[in-house]
Amino acid sequence: MPPARGWRRARKPLIGLLVCLLLLCAAALTGVLWLQAKVESNIQRLPDTFTGLTDRPDKPTSGSAADAMNILVLGTDTRSDAPTTGAEAPGWEPGQARSDTMLLVHLDGDRDSASVISIPRDSWVDIPGHGKGKVNWAYSFGGPNLTVETVEKMTDVRIDHLTVIDWDGFKALTDAIGGVDIDIPKTVYDSARDVRWEAGRHHLNGEEALLYVRQRYGLQDGDLDRVARQQAFLRTLLKQTLEQELRKNPDQVLDLLSLFSKHASVDDDWSTTQMAKLAASLRNLRTDDISYLTVPTDGTGMVGDQSVVRLDPSRDRDLWRAVREDRMGDWAEDNQDLLTPDVVR
């Protein structure tokens, strides 16, 4: 069982803020030196993220797969008032937090497309040294290092980099661009927060956006529907930020990047120079070139007193093989039913 929970802040979900960070970097054609210095002063380095990991999946050495990149993105459910990311955050401590949401971001070798793959936090998996458990327990048990090891063992995909993101940044960006429009197809009621969402279009500020993407109760598929909401909101957020707001005010990109770097922590092998080069390589990536999906599952169930998500071994193997071989475009064509639609429950 995971360490006992202490007082905890209301859980905030993760949407792929890393994608925002990298794509916004790509939009900045000037001010690179200023940007690097600003990010370097704001961002926290996570020590020993990959230290001591053995029997890791091989890194492809030929074809487009050799140039592809896999980034594990985590958001944490904190148990204290201390910041969990950014330069002012303390180091990881056992039991302080679990990874509330987990994404594997695959950047194709040609950098013309990307995939954001959600791994449900309740996925029942093997955690090295701890037996079976929910995938989000790994962060509580052993921090970034054990989380990377757990995901690599589960997927047989080599993780190139890790980032942990604070959800205050999600709220701040939503407010910074003046809110985001979202369509709700059917009226739903969130009994946990006493919020009723009427069918139709809603213009959400940062606080409202958090309520929207955090809802689980009242949705047909619970946590899986919440993951779909997070992905759909991210797609809208990125599109509005990059294709509307920054066209009207290109200089705003530096302010947005400075804001986001305050809420991010990355592995200590990932230098600011490397991040800048990656950002430049993504300059032609459009929001329509990003696919969103959830790892295939086989429903939910109970293990003892734990509500868990059961993964689908057969379809999962096909997905992770496509990631390793940098064939996500072909995989998506054959698995349209697993892609997150623009409008979700």
PLM ranges: what are they?
Residues P3-A97:
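N-terminal hydrophobic targeting segments that direct proteins to the cell envelope
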Residues L46, R56, A82, L204, ...:
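C-terminal solvent-exposed extensions
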Residues P47, S99-T101, K132, N136, ...:
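Extracytoplasmic/secreted envelope proteins and their assembly/folding machinery
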Residues F50-P60, A82-L103, W137-M154, R158-I159, ...:
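N-terminal post-signal-peptidase region of extra-cytosolic proteins
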Residues A66-M69, A97-M102, R111-I119, H130-K132, ...:
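Extracytoplasmic
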Residues M69, L173-D251, A264, V344:
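Flexible, polar/acidic helix-loop-strand segments at domain edges
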Residues P90-E93, G133-F141, D156-H161, A199, ...:
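Second-shell loop/turn segments in exported
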Residues V135-R196:
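Amphipathic, coiled-coil-like alpha-helical scaffolding segments used for oligomerization/assembly
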